[in-house]
């Protein structure tokens, strides 16, 4: 019974194995980025940039249909363009960067939906907005795995300045010039992983496997390395459980994955050993034995 419910879907169906491999790749690449977004108080920036890739992906769709490379290139170009434009607006006007990103996010979402609607059907629009990880083909899986690998390599190179910048950015500027290049590389990784998530979960849910696991990890560890490990594990568990839930109940796979992650987040808020609500209400219970 347990085998049929939890394991058989992946041994019997190739599309489930592809989806699971994609979830693992997204977890390895996206969850560490989510931890740094949270530590740098940029979680909403990640959400805004997730929606900002929509017009580029929509233009790729308009020109080539549901073509992997056209939509990937369009999403990357749009994501980088919005990040750069938001920074320019924030530095040359009185509008702060979060407000300028929010403006571009709203415009991008409206523009992207309009572009997709010009050529596509409601089914195409739903595919772009919410993705379909169960329809993953080998090419898309390879792109996701490649981007995750690049993310881990670059993150290993810029890990030290990123950590220092999270703790003391003034000190980093004093002792090193690596702060600005590391920040730019980090923004590039954010865009790359949002495009990765877009292929599997769509633009509206792409940021989910980045931010929710990071939030979960924050309630279980104070150490950055520990938070990254917990975030990756919780993202993987959410993906696996969400796929099983989707397969057994026929609910959409993307929302199922995010809802499982949300359930883990609520559990962590209540019972996490770092500032969880239950621990705050009963601070001495852990000393009893």
Regions picked out by a protein language model, each given a short descriptive name:
Residues 1-28:
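Membrane-interfacial amphipathic/re-entrant helices at transmembrane-helix boundaries
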Residues 3-10, 93, 100-160:
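Transmembrane helix-bundle core of multi-pass membrane transporters
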Residues 20-25, 72-77, 99-103, 141-146, ...:
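Hydrophobic alpha-helical transmembrane segments
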Residues 35-50, 54-122, 217-229, 246-248, ...:
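Short loop segments and helix-boundary regions at transmembrane helix junctions
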Residues 52-60, 103-115, 135-136, 179-189, ...:
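Small-residue-rich segments of transmembrane alpha-helices in multi-pass membrane proteins
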Residues 141-213:
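Helix-loop-helix "hairpin" substructures at the membrane interface of multi-pass membrane proteins
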Residues 204-255:
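Transmembrane alpha-helical segments in multi-pass inner-membrane proteins
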Residues 251-289:
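Cytosolic-side transmembrane-helix boundaries in multi-pass membrane proteins
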């Amino acid at each position: 019974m347990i085998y049929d419910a939890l394991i058989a879907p992946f041994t019997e169906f190739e599309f489930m194995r592809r989806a699971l491999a994609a979830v693992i790749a997204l977890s390895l690449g996206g969850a560490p980025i989510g931890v740094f977004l949270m530590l740098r108080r940029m979680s909403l920036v990640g959400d805004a940039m997730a929606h900002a890739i929509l017009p580029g992906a929509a233009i790729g769709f308009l020109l080539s249909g549901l073509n992997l490379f056209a939509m990937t290139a369009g999403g990357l170009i749009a994501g980088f363009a919005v990040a750069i434009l938001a920074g320019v607006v924030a530095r040359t006007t009185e509008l702060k960067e979060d407000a300028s990103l929010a403006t571009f996010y709203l415009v991008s979402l409206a523009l992207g939906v309009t572009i997709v609607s010009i050529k596509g059907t409601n089914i195409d629009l739903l595919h772009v907005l919410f993705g379909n990880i169960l329809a993953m083909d080998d090419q898309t899986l390879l792109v996701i795995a490649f981007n995750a690998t690049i993310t881990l390599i670059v993150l290993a190179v810029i890990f030290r300045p990123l950590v220092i910048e999270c703790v003391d950015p003034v000190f980093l500027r004093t002792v090193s010039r690596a702060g600005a290049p590391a920040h730019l590389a980090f923004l590039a990784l954010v865009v790359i992983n949002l495009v990765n998530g877009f292929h599997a979960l769509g633009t509206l849910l792409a940021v989910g496997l980045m931010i929710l696991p990071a939030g979960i990890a924050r309630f279980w560890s104070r150490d950055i390395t520990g938070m990254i490990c917990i975030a990756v594990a919780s993202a993987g568990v959410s993906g696996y459980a969400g796929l099983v839930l989707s397969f057994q109940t026929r609910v959409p796979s993307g929302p199922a994955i995010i809802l499982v992650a949300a359930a883990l987040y609520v559990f962590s808020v209540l019972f996490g050993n770092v500032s969880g609500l239950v621990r705050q209400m009963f601070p001495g219970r852990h000393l009893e034995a």
